């Protein structure tokens, strides 16, 4: 009976995850990005942001008992005193991306219509800029752990701004709102408890439309940064004599 329940959990989260991917692709299509080179970069980066955010919450709840008992993990983390929060970050393992409180998906969701937000110079802070700045700041904050070095030892960051692919400035914030509203609908937390390799089939589903028809979407490949993260997720333990392309 326990095994049946576990499989039902996996089935449910698989359906939700594939629906999220389809919804993200639909959003791209609605904003004129369907089938464009930018669509693939948006989908993979947004999915990775979702994964790393949920993984962070899951790992934080393992090292901080009070968080594990909370109904809303991100809300409980946000309420933590800053000193306790910094201590918790130090206790997380090296394979977990570290997040600041304003990096959370819930933070972006709660501020998507906040007209009171201002930049340092006092000018309005459009939501698409907040979204982009959050992704870039996560990448910079985790540069030493989650980045890939080129042959010239230049570090390729985890994320880049995604609203740049929306041509019309007036539509950029609406695009980012549509994205963030899809990311709050469920959590991967249940999957992290399973030994089943859930994400292998999800990654196949994620890229299936970009790896067929020999050029229908121009020429696609998995960015080195994304491929490296995928490899770390799918392969556990030390690996030698292996190259990620």
Segments predicted by a language model, with ranges:
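Conserved class I S-adenosyl-L-methionine
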Residues: 239-245
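Non-catalytic, mostly N-terminal accessory regions of nucleic-acid modification and defense proteins
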Residues: 1-239
């Amino acid at each position: 009976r326990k095994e049946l329940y576990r499989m039902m959990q996996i089935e449910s989260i698989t359906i939700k995850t594939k629906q999220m991917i389809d919804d993200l692709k639909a959003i791209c299509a609605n904003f004129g990005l369907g089938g464009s080179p930018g669509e693939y970069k948006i989908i993979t980066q947004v999915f990775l942001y979702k994964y790393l955010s949920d993984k962070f919450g899951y790992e934080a709840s393992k090292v901080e008992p009070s968080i594990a008992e909370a109904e809303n993990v991100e809300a409980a983390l946000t309420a933590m005193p800053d000193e306790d929060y910094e201590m918790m970050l130090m206790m997380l393992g090296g394979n977990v991306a570290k997040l600041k409180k304003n990096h959370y998906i819930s933070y972006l969701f709660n501020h998507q219509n906040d007209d009171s937000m201002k930049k340092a110079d006092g000018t309005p802070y459009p939501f698409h800029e907040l979204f982009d700045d959050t992704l870039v700041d996560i990448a910079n904050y985790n540069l030493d752990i989650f980045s890939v070095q080129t042959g010239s030892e230049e570090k390729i960051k985890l994320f880049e701004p995604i609203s740049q692919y929306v041509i019309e400035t007036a539509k950029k914030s609406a695009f980012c709102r549509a994205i963030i509203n899809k990311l709050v609908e469920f959590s991967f937390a249940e999957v992290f408890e399973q030994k089943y390799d859930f994400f292998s089939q999800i990654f196949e589903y994620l890229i299936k439309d970009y790896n067929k028809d020999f050029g229908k979407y121009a020429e696609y490949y998995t960015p080195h940064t994304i491929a490296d993260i995928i490899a770390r997720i799918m392969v556990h333990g030390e690996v030698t004599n292996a190259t990620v392309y």
